[in-house]
């Protein structure tokens, strides 16, 4: 009510606010007319038939006893005037909509319970047309035959959604008391129309409650729900009372179903993400295993290559060592050959002299032997001293020649001895140098092997660093 008063105060230019509401004269109506008018009265939309105008006059008479009710009634009439102007504008633009359908909305007056002193079965007095002649939204009374109940219900269902959209666009909200009456009268609509409306209402409720419904279906379902509230509020006036029922609690089963659906969707999304992560993990494991196999094969190939290279290098080093030994042997042989070649003439002379002295010595020994054999060995020996002396002299002379020759050969032999000693000393020095070369060759071989090992380690370290950089960059 306060919201409606605030809306009416926001529009002070409406002429219906200051106009006094005259008291309608009492009139008698038939029960049939009363039944039809009370059936189609609603606190949401304005009435266009004569029965709705008579019910509005009755409500005006009931609420005009106090100034507060009079002020509220004026505010409601002002809002109804504004709403009627909008409806007239819409009716002018819509050529396919009949006038009776456009004016079949109910009165916007709130339902109030009649005092206990008045008879609830009293006939509703109709308000004459000339009472509200100054209002722009006063409907004209149409002399039409009373429609049937099913026809009016169908007309109500067709026009309620458009009227509800119009009321929502104008900014008019419903009070909490009308919601209870709508729940009560909706049951009567279901009873009157039969099971024809049940499938559509259930499907609309399902479409409205599902979390995956589109905004368009939700808006349509909300319009249909407001339509049923309008129909229930209009049918609540049939009994003459406006008691509001307690609000219906939301369907906990539907909420639980939606929660379960959301939870299932979340679980499905989690399962999908876990599957994606597992697939990515398997891909990475496959990539790592493939890279590890490749690195192992490359490592084995490199080790085989290094081993073969090491064998080749060891063979080369052995061959080099052998060649060096041969070279040193040849060098020493050359040195000895040069020394011997320088002494070859002397040696040849020595051979000639040796032959001569050997022959002379042999002859001397033979001569001495012959001379000794000629000496008599019995008692009757007679020696010629002269011949013996001559033989001894000859022998001594030959011995002296031999001694002289030997004396001549002694310095040569001493020289040869010095040369041989020098040669022995040189050969010892060469042996020591050969041993030093052997040790140096062993050291170079070990250092070469160590160098190859360090190079292989350096290559492996550089390869590992390159692989780590590649993995970090990926």
Swiss-Prot record:
The keyword Phosphoprotein applies. A motif (QWRF motif) lies at residues 283-286. Interacts with GRF5 in a phosphorylation-independent manner. The binding to microtubules occurs independently of the interaction with GRF5. The keyword Phosphoprotein applies. This is Protein ENDOSPERM DEFECTIVE 1. It comes from the Eukaryota. The lineage of its organism: Eukaryota, Viridiplantae, Streptophyta, Embryophyta, Tracheophyta. One of its GO terms (molecular function) is microtubule binding. It is found in: Cytoplasm; Cytoplasm, Cytoskeleton. GO terms for cellular component: cytoplasm; nuclear microtubule; nucleus. Belongs to the QWRF family. GO terms for biological process: cell division; endosperm cellularization; endosperm development; microtubule cytoskeleton organization; seed development. Induction: Cell cycle-dependent regulation. Up-regulated during the G2/M phase. The modification Phosphoserine is found at residue 66. Phosphorylated. Microtubule-associated protein required for seed development and for microtubule function in the endosperm. Associates with nuclear microtubules during mitosis. Binds to microtubules of the spindle and spindle-poles and to midzone microtubules out of which the phragmoplast emerges. Not associated with cortical microtubules. Required for endosperm cellularization. May be bound and sequestered by GRF5 in an inactive soluble form during the early stages of mitosis.
């Amino acid at each position: 009510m306060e919201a409606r008063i605030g809306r009416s105060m926001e529009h002070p230019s409406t002429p219906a606010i200051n106009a006094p509401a005259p008291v309608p004269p009492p009139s008698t109506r038939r029960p049939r007319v009363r039944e039809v008018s009370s059936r189609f009265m609603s606190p949401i939309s304005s009435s266009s038939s004569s029965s709705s105008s008579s019910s509005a006059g009755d409500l005006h008479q009931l609420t005009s006893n106090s100034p507060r009710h009079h002020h509220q009634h004026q505010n409601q009439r002002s809002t109804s005037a504004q709403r009627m102007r909008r409806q007239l504008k819409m009716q002018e633009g819509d050529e396919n909509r009949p006038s009776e359908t456009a004016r079949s909305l109910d009165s916007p007056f709130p339902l109030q319970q009649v005092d206990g002193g008045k008879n609830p079965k009293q006939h509703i007095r109709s308000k004459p047309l000339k009472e509200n002649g100054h209002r722009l939204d006063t409907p004209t009374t149409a002399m039409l035959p009373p429609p049937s109940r099913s026809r009016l219900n169908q007309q109500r269902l067709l026009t309620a959604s458009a009227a509800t959209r119009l009321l929502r666009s104008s900014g008019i909200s419903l009070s909490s008391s009308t919601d209870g009456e709508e729940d009560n009268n909706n049951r009567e609509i279901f009873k009157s129309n039969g099971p024809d409306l049940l499938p559509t209402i259930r499907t609309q409720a399902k479409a409205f409650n599902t979390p995956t419904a589109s905004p368009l279906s939700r808006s349509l379902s909300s319009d249909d729900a407001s339509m049923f509230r309008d129909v229930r509020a209009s049918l609540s006036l049939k009994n003459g009372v406006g008691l509001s029922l307690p609000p219906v609690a939301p369907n906990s089963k539907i909420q639980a179903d939606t929660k379960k659906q959301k939870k299932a969707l979340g679980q499905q999304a989690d399962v999908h993400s876990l599957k994606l992560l597992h697939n990515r993990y398997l891909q990475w494991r496959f990539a790592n295993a493939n890279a590890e196999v490749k690195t192992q094969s490359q490592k084995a190939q490199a080790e085989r290559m290094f081993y073969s290279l090491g064998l080749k290098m060891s063979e080369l080093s052995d061959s080099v060592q052998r060649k060096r030994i041969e070279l040193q042997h040849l060098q020493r042989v050359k040195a000895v050959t040069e020394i011997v070649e320088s002494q070859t003439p002397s040696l040849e002379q020595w051979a000639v002299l040796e032959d001569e002295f050997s022959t002379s010595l042999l002859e001397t020994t033979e001569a001495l032997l012959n001379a000794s054999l000629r000496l008599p060995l019995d008692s009757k020996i007679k020696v010629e001293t002269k011949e013996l002396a001559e033989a001894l002299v000859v022998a001594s002379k030959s011995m002296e020649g031999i001694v002289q020759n030997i004396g001549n050969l002694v310095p040569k032999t001493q020289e040869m001895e010095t040369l041989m000693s020098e040669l022995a000393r040189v050969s010892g020095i060469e042996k020591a140098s050969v041993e030093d070369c052997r040790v140096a060759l062993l050291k170079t071989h070990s250092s070469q092997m160590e160098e190859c090992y360090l190079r292989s380690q350096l290559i492996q370290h550089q390869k590992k660093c390159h692989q780590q950089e590649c993995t970090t960059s990926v």
